[in-house]
Each structure stands twice: as C-alpha cells, then as structure tokens.
Amino acid sequence: MNSGYPLANDLQGSMKNTNYKDWLAMCENNQQYGVNPAAINSSSVSTALKVAGAILKFVNPPAGTVLTVLSAVLPILWPTNTPTPERVWNDFMTNTGNLIDQTVTAYVRTDANAKMTVVKDYLDQYTTKFNTWKREPNNQSYRTAVITQFNLTSAKLRETAVYFSNLVGYELLLLPIYAQVANFNLLLIRDGLINAQEWSLARSAGDQLYNTMVQYTKEYIAHSITWYNKGLDVLRNKSNGQWITFNDYKREMTIQVLDILALFASYDPRRYPADKIDNTKLSKTEFTREIYTALVESPSSKSIAALEAALTRDVHLFTWLKRVDFWTNTIYQDLRFLSANKIGFSYTNSSAMQESGIYGSSGFGSNLTHQIQLNSNVYKTSITDTSSPSNRVTKMDFYKIDGTLASYNSNITPTPEGLRTTFFGFSTNENTPNQPTVNDYTHILSYIKTDVIDYNSNRVSFAWTHKIVDPNNQIYTDAITQVPAVKSNFLNATAKVIKGPGHTGGDLVALTSNGTLSGRMEIQCKTSIFNDPTRSYGLRIRYAANSPIVLNVSYVLQGVSRGTTISTESTFSRPNNIIPTDLKYEEFRYKDPFDAIVPMRLSSNQLITIAIQPLNMTSNNQVIIDRIEIIPITQSVLDETENQNLESEREVVNALFTNDAKDALNIGTTDYDIDQAANLVECISEELYPKEKMLLLDEVKNAKQLSQSRNVLQNGDFESATLGWTTSDNITIQEDDPIFKGHYLHMSGARDIDGTIFPTYIFQKIDESKLKPYTRYLVRGFVGSSKDVELVVSRYGEEIDAIMNVPADLNYLYPSTFDCEGSNRCETSAVPANIGNTSDMLYSCQYDTGKKHVVCQDSHQFSFTIDTGALDTNENIGVWVMFKISSPDGYASLDNLEVIEEGPIDGEALSRVKHMEKKWNDQMEAKRSETQQAYDVAKQAIDALFTNVQDEALQFDTTLAQIQYAEYLVQSIPYVYNDWLSDVPGMNYDIYVELDARVAQARYLYDTRNIIKNGDFTQGVMGWHVTGNADVQQIDGVSVLVLSNWSAGVSQNVHLQHNHGYVLRVIAKKEGPGNGYVTLMDCEENQEKLTFTSCEEGYITKTVDVFPDTDRVRIEIGETEGSFYIESIELICMNE
C-alpha cells in the first residue's frame, strides 16, 4: 500500500504479476482499471464495531439467546475460529501503535495478553456459573457459587483496569483494551444490581454496589477521555503531522473507545430498569457522531487545521443525506475530472430539503453534470482517480441498502492510464473491513466535501453516521427511548449545537440567552403502532446547567399542546462563562419522570413535537441538553416505581434521626425537611403498602414533635398564628402555598404614607431562661420567595444581618393545584426526591463570620449561628430574631423557623463570645450612665414645672418655654426605641413614657389656665383676628407669630371674671427700628401695654398685672416698624 494514499490501491502494483490469461479475464469482465479493494480499516475496528453492535442488539434481543450481555461479547473478543486467542488484543495494540507512531514492546504485548487471558478465565467461570444458576435459580449451591465468582471477577476486572491505566508510557496505546475491560466491569456490576435481591445484595450492599458502579463509570470515562484528547494533541502538534493520520486516529479511536464509553450511562439499572421478562434488554443508545474517510494526497500541502475545516463539518444538527450534486471540469474532453459538489439534506422527521454551499471549484470551466437523488441510504462508496498526477477523480459509486447503485462519472475520454479505486465503508467482517455488504455494514453515508488541490486535483471526504440512528425517532412501547438533542429539527437563534465531550455518543445542544430571547429546541418523534387508544409515557431530560434554571417543557400531538415547567440543578461552572465542550460524566443530571415529569398520553403512529425552552434566563445562564428520554408508564413500571419510592422514602425518614431508636434528630435535619418527608410519606400507596405507610407516618410525626421540643423559638411554623411573635399590621398567616406544609408567614412590603416609610416586621425575643450558657445555636428556616427581606439575629449586637432575595422558582415542584382536600402534591410529584439534603438542593445561605452584613441571593434555605455567653436572668438579654422589610415593593413568604442548640463552644469561639460579652457589658454600662444623666436632667426640669409631686398644678411662673425645654430634654433621652425598628420599645422606653406623660400633663395644665385661646400659636392664627401681613412661622421647632409690617394687626376678645386680678405674660422679641407691643384693654378703656424694642436681645419675657373693670377685654398685638416675633401670650388668673 502506498503510504501516501492509505485508503487507496495502486493499479500498477496490482498488475505487476498478472499474466496474459489474467488480462483476458479482466477484459472479459469489462474491467478497465484495477479494483482491488483496500483494507482501509483495521481488524480491531471491525472487532470494536461487532462489540458495540452486539450490545446495541440487546435493545430487542432474540428470546432465550443468552442469559447475560457478557455472554454475547466474549466470543467476539476471544473468537474460537482463530489459532491465536490473543489475536484480537494484539490487533488493538498494533493498530493503536500505528495510529500514534508508537512501537509495542514485546514485554508490554506479552504482559497485556497475559492479563487478558486471566480476565477471560474469570469471565468464562462467571458466565458458566451465572447460566447454571439462572436455569435453577432456587438452587442454593448454584447461587452461592455465582455470587462468589461475581465478587472475584469484579475485583479482577477492576485490578486489570487500574493496571492498564497506570502503565506509564503506554496509557494511550492500551486505551482500547482498557475500554473493553471497563466495559466488562460495568456490565458485570449491572448483572449484580439486577440480581441484587436474589443474591442478597438488596439495600445496603446493593447501594454500595450501585455507588461503586457510579464511581467506576466516572473514573473509566475520565481516564479514557483524558488520554484520547492527549493523543489528539500529540498528532495535532507534530511538526510534520498529516491530517490523514490525525483523521485516522479520530475515526478509529472513536469506534474503539468513545463509542464504548457512550454505552456506559445506559447500563445503570436504576435509571434504565431491567425488563422483568428479559433482564438482558438494554435501553437503546444512538451514536450521532460523524466519522470521516477521505481521499487525500500525501504529503498534503495544507495544515491539519486547514484540512479539518475543509474536509469535515462544523457542529450541526443530525442530518440525513438526500441528494448529491457534482460539478465536472468540462473544458477539455481528456481532462474531465470532478471539480466540486453540493449536498441536499434534511433534519430528522423533516420533509424540508436543506442545501449546503458548493465545495470545491465551480467557476470557469466547471459545470453541474450530476444530481443524484438518494432515496435509500448509502452503506459503501468507491472513488476512481488517477495515480499520477494523483487525485483526479473520474468516477464515484454509491452502494445503497435497497440493492441499487448510483454513480458519478466524469465521462473522460480516452480513459486515462494508471487509474485506481478506493473503497470506503465499515464492515464487521474483519477480512473486508472497508467493503461492507448490505448484511454486515455498520455506517451510512451522511455528507461529502470536495477540496481543491489544484486545477484538476481534489481531495474528497465522506462523513459517516452509525446505522443505529433511527430516522423517525421511533418511540418504543416496551423500553425507554433515547433521543439525542442533536436530532432536533429546529433551533432558534439562541440555541446552538456544541461539540460533545466524547462520552455522549455525539454533540450536544446548548440553550443560551441574549438577555431577551432564550434558546428553544424542538424534536419530532413518532409513536409506535399499538392497539390501545392511547398509551402513557413520561419524559426525562439528561442535561447539564451552570445554574438553577426553570425550563418550559411541552409537547404537541395532533395540534394540542401540553406541558409544564421544571427546574434544573447547577451542575457545572466554567471561568468567563464559556460554553463547555469538556463536560464530565458527573456534570450531567437527569430530570426524572417521577420527580418532575411531563406526563404524555400518546396515540398510535403519530408525530409528536417536543419543545424545551428556558424561562427568564440571563445572558450568563446555560442549559446543555444531551438527550430526551421517553419512558413507557406501564403497570410494572409504576409498581417498581412505588417500590423504589417506598425504599427512598424510608431512607429519607431514617435520615432524619441519629439512630435506629429514632429518639433524637440529626443536627442537620431541618423542620422543613420533616414537613417535606411527611409529604413524601403521604404519597405512598395505601393499597400497596398500608402498614409501611402507617409506620412511616408515625415516625415522621415523632420527628416533628422532637423538632418542636428542641426549638427554643416559639411557634416557628406559625401553626398557632402569630403566638409568641410581635408583628406590624401587614403580616398575615396563610396556608395556600404547597411549598409549605400547613401555615406559613406572608410579609407584604413596607407602607409608604405621604413619603414616610413604615417597615413590615415580625420579631420574637427568646428569653434567657430558654438558653444555655456558652452554647452555639443554629438559626435557620425556609424562604419560599422574598425580596428585600432583612433577617437580624442579635444578642450582643447585630451578630447576624442578612438581606435575602429569593426567586419564586419552586413552582415546578409545587404546582398550585388545590381541591377541597388541599394541594394534590402526589399527582404533581411536587416533593423533591432528595429532600433529606435540601441544604444542597436549595442552595443554603450561610453566614460569613468575617462580614457584618451579607446578601443571600437565590437561597431558599438559610442557616446561621449565634453564640451565648454567661446567662443573667435579671438582665434577660435573650436572643432577638427579627424579619423586616423596608421597601414598599418587598415581600416574603417564610416558614419552619427554628433556633436549636448545636452544642457548647470552646477554643476561639469561646474566647470570641467572652470578648463580645465584655464589650457589650461595657457598652451597656456606658448606656446606663448616659441614660441616668439624661434622666436626672429631664426629671429635674419637669419637677420644677409643678407645685407638688402629684403634678396637680403648675408653678405660677412656669412658662411655655420651660415646658418646651423640659419636653426637649425628654426627647433627648437615648435608647428609647429598638435599634432596628423605630416604633418598637427599647431599653429606656418605660422611663421615657413616664417623663413624657408628665410633660403632657404640664402642657395640659398650661393650656387649661391660659384664658387666651391658642396663646402659643401651635394652631396657627386660629382664634385670632388678623389684618395685614401677619402669620405663624416655625422657627427652631417653635410656632411663632410674626408681624412684618406696621399695618399688620392681630387681636382677640377674651371673656373674664371681673373683680379678679390677672397676669399678662408675653414672650417675644423685636427686630429692626420701631416698637412691638401687646395691649390689654377693657370696655372702660382701661389698658395695660407691654412694649418690646430691638435693644432687648433675643426673646424676652415680660409681665404686667391687670385688674379689668369689665368681664370682657381685648388683646391687641402690633408694631410701629420692623419685625415683631411673639412666641406666646398668657393671661393667667391670680387665683390659680
């Protein structure tokens, strides 16, 4: 074979030894040029294809053929018709060594073969004992034998896989063998899990085995992908690297390694339950990846990167080849060669024809000469081209599975010498690996690209997809149907195909957002033919996401649309928000049908369109879809699900407690966990498990009682309305939200009254008597949704101050469907499956002791700690727990609030709380001293206002200014109200109320004894007759009558008891020239006058005794010039 043309057969070389008789035979067969098929694919590739094909056939295995999948694989890897049993493993090593230009040493080859011989012996013993037991499953000795051999074989397979992965310098060369050993190991573990109950591996041992399977799957995939990519990097970066070698490596390692990895996820019997009649049956896996064969000159004049772009496709939705157009250079009859091509293709279940661009040269001298309609899949192709000069293509044949042949022929005349033929295809026949027949082909043609070398020479590449891919996305009636996301037939502008990580069998679909439009994908599937009117199915999604995202999942059947919303978990994170093409196995999750399901009732033989689109995505959000899975909901599936649910719910309930006696709760068990566990238990079928349900309900009720007894916060679940809490008016206790079990707290936004904000709040003080000294307490709860709600927890200050903004994103778990009996949680599958770990699932907000304030975004669970120091029941510091909303558009729904003991503190925590305690005591001492000083001054001022300690009368010379000053002193008393709430009493509230009441009494007595109405002008000029420019102004917080012009006048007529003496007292000041005056005049024209001038600085108090001769007098205020300010006017009877 010419090393420059690894896919071609040289005509001259094939004819060197022909005689005249051979030549005549060739002429009789009209064979004008050599057709000696080239073995372009190694025998190891054919072997790998047979292994994958054998496993894929177990989607619908022939009845009674084998009892375990391993039995079908072993004869392929250790064929009986070969004199050297290790031939297959030698082929794997030799082929890989050729691909990466590495020689297999005799030691490595011998050692690897020895290891695999031991593996074969263990597997043979296992399959023999398994089949013996399977035929007599009640035979105890057979059961013991198979269990023992299972354990021994599993250990040996694991040991062998680890050995191959750690053989330094040969990790890549041995990778295909490693993949096969990993495959053995996982298929074996699958047997153990399927037969766990009969082998007494149920529950704890079975769970351990399942965890082992998950861990091994993760490790086997990670190792394989790492070394596959290292091989690519080595070939890509070689200084003299050729694309043909690079492509050979990608193609053959995809078949030998990556395709095997793509099967692993389907081995999980808990995700893909084994069929009860035939437990060898597997869920169908589809390989949507494309691999390439090509005719390329060597050495090529283009780089690996350039040829990769020219001869392969960028990522795309899965397509089906429908038409090929060919251009031919037609300028000269003897130079008629292929010059370009174009492709017509369609997406799955789409009748619309899509067209590619033109590949090659279709310009001057080239004409469209062929349009080949492909109404049947092509399983083999051949190219005829010249060998010197090379790559001038004259003919191309397409072998179709319907038995017909389609051809391109440039019709060059005369026929050039030195033609050669290259065959392309994939066969499970090791003797003709690149020349499949209609009976043994594994791939179909999906695309062709032509790339120009020079005027008449071209490179040609063929893209191939595995024949396992279903053209209709047929939905099985008796097995889980997997439909890769790249088989969508519609993506909108913000949905895109991205490169797969290598272990998913193909590429993926990323749903992103530009800030306004979220990505949308649509997949069309076709239901099978069945006799029932309808059948029930559930829809599951395998995905990865970089944050919790709500998805709208819907389907359209016969014009009717149905759907729901579900939510993803956050499964991965990448720097700079790049879209990952290296997702790990463990970064994928399933949205399960029995958690949040799109229930579907489908009719026979109908097309159904399934759509997925995120809601309210930000530009940073990403959801990456691997595949959707459609699960037939049969009675056996439901029964199995009920059984699994019972076991899961038993585990959830057991996880609430610390021991089997169930007399103490785990510290991590929240009150919310207990409520949700109760919801789970209530959904257990009473028909199937009445006793189990009753026992579990009793245990959950016990857990609730234990939760309430350890909670030092009173009424944290609001089942007794607001008992124990102090609240503002706009607090309500509701029970209409299925997120919560029973009552919950609803807080509305703060009230805005004429620009003044009145916060919404609720708080509770935990008395000292309920606490323990030097102890840490957990403060936690559950937020359904909130905006701008502030949590403050305090003992020695604001130890906890958190703002919680939590979106209302749990509706998919808890649809608002109520009937007369309450929320129908069971039918809607409202309860999260992993409720025992809600802190992880719902992104618990925890306190950072290094920060004074924190903001919690998207955290439904919150959990903080607060420490106590020494206790003082007299001081009764306690612990304050408060929720507050200070913005009018804020809101919150809360429940399951608890403060529970975590345990005694020591070390640094103990030192810290003692420091805080001392600091708080020092601050309190300073506050008490400050309070005492303020109190003494205010009390002294108030005492001076009255004639006795009973505050029955004012001193005669008590003025309004003195009362106002006393009021000022009272208002200056500190710490009257709570630091966080301006209308909640603080430490000095009681003494403030006492003194404020005495000031109010003084003011009342003052107003009562003043015969003049509104003499302090607090009611403006009410009661006064005003002319000219006079009004009441607020000056330094005091109402002052101001006269600004000589023409202004203010007067009031007053009724007196004559024959009594009175005192007229005025506090006022004059500014500017002229005088200000206040005159009292009776009806006998007797008058008294108080005069003020600007020579008198500030406000002056002046009095005059008056003895009116009549019972009516007139008070008149005026000025001659300038401004006159009157603070108060009193007329007091001398008998008072």
Curated annotation (Swiss-Prot):
SUPFAM superfamilies, A to Z: delta-Endotoxin (insectocide), middle domain (SSF51096), delta-Endotoxin (insectocide), N-terminal domain (SSF56849), Galactose-binding domain-like (SSF49785)
Positions in coiled-coil regions: none
Renumbered residue ranges of the record's region Domain III: 467-641
Region called Domain II, residue ranges: 283-466
Misc note: One of several insecticidal Cry and Cyt proteins in the parasporal crystal.
Regulation of its activity: Toxic activity on Trichoplusia ni insect cells stably transfected with the AgCad1/BT-R3 receptor leads to oncosis, cell death characterized by cell swelling, membrane blebbing and depletion of energy reserves.
Alphabetized UniProt keyword annotations: Magnesium, Plasmid, Signal, Sporulation, Toxin, Virulence
Annotated domain remarks: The toxic segment of the protein is located in the N-terminus; it is about 65 kDa in size. The first 83 residues are not necessary for toxicity and presumably include the signal sequence. An active fragment (residues 84-641) has 3 domains; domain I is an alpha-helical bundle of five helices, domain II is a beta-prism of three antiparallel beta-sheets and domain III is a beta-sandwich of two antiparallel beta-sheets. Domains II and II pack on top of each other and against the long side of domain I.
Alphabetized Gene3D superfamilies for the sequence: Galactose-binding domain-like (2.60.120.260), Pesticidal crystal protein, central domain (2.100.10.10), Pesticidal crystal protein, N-terminal domain (1.20.190.10)
Subcellular location: Spore
Cofactor binding, per record: Mg(2+) is required for toxic activity in insect cells.
Biotechnology: Whole bacteria have been used since 1977 to control mosquito populations.
The name this protein goes by in its record: Pesticidal crystal protein Cry4B protoxin
Tissue expression profile of the protein: Host (A.gambiae) larval midgut; binds to host brush border membranes, probably to cadherin-AgCad1 (Cad1, also called BT-R3).
UniProt entry tagged with the keyword S-adenosyl-L-methionine: no
Assembly with partners or alone: In the presence of micelles active toxin forms oligomers that can be fit into cryo-EM maps as trimers. Binds to host (A.gambiae) cadherin AgCad1 (also called BT-R3), probably on the cell surface. Activated toxin may bind its host AgCad1 receptor as a monomer, but also forms an oligomer that is not active.
PANTHER family in alphabetical order: ENDOTOXIN_N DOMAIN-CONTAINING PROTEIN-RELATED (PTHR37003), PESTICIDAL CRYSTAL PROTEIN N-TERMINAL DOMAIN-CONTAINING PROTEIN (PTHR37003:SF2)
Keyword Iron-sulfur among UniProt keywords: no
Region (Domain I): 84-282
A GO biological-process term: sporulation resulting in formation of a cellular spore
GO molecular function: signaling receptor binding; toxin activity
The family this protein is said to belong to: Belongs to the delta endotoxin family.
Post-translational modification: Treatment of recombinant protein with A.aegypti 3rd instar larvae midgut extract for 1 hour yields major bands of 72 and 45 kDa, the combined proteins are toxic to mosquitoes. Longer digestion, which removes the 72 kDa protein, yields a non-toxic preparation. Proteolysis by yields a 65 kDa toxic protein and 48 and 17 kDa fragments which are not toxic.
Major localization class: other
Organism annotation: Bacillus thuringiensis subsp. israelensis
UniProt cross-references to InterPro entries, sorted A to Z: Cry1Ac-like_dom-VII, Cry_V, Galactose-bd-like_sf, Pest_crys, Pest_crys_dom-III, Pest_crys_dom_I, Pest_crys_N_sf, Pest_cryst_cen_dom_sf
